[in-house]
UniProtKB/Swiss-Prot annotation:
Its EC number is 3.5.4.13. It comes from the Bacteria. Catalyzes the deamination of dCTP to dUTP. GO terms for molecular function: dCTP deaminase activity; nucleotide binding. The keyword Hydrolase applies. Pathway: Pyrimidine metabolism; dUMP biosynthesis; dUMP from dCTP (dUTP route): step 1/2. GO terms for biological process: dUMP biosynthetic process; dUTP biosynthetic process; nucleobase-containing small molecule interconversion. Homotrimer. This is dCTP deaminase. It catalyses: dCTP + H2O + H(+) = dUTP + NH4(+). Belongs to the dCTP deaminase family.
Amino acid sequence: MGLKSDTWIKKMSKKGMIEPFCEKQVGKNIVSYGLSSYGYDIRVGNEFMIFTNIGANLVDPKSFDERNVVEITTEENGYCLVPPNSFALARTIEYFRIPRNVLAICLGKSTYARCGIIVNVTPFEPEFEGHITIEISNTTPLPAKIYANEGIAQVLFLEGDETCEVSYKDKKGKYQGQKGITLPKVIK
């Protein structure tokens, strides 16, 4: 597998791999986002779901209760406060269309990690299409700000040695085509 460069990412963005696409790194007085040498820094939207214990008492990934979360929408350039030792879901501004021969891996930005805020996103499988749901953990004993419309994580694109036999689209992945924040699903 080879790591793809800014040249390749820019070329693929013209084919709709990332929309909207920012051709350069933007980062003055904000958490940076946009194209980097070997990746793309994604932005978090202004919609969040914060976990709460009001109205529910158990988190079950096989039978998720929507009462476990409170929906919050911030101003376009506002922020969301994630409570101490708590968890939030958000989504990317960007919509992705991953090529069949590519797997993308997402890593949290060090700006947030150095504040005790951990970002997790599972790999973007070949032929996945949709917004990315972002998992955000505040590991600190203090409230933490997440800035809407600013950088949150970096995506690295890896091209396979050969094209996969079965893509995410082929297997009708449960999160295919997701728009907005998508809560956990189990295929029944």
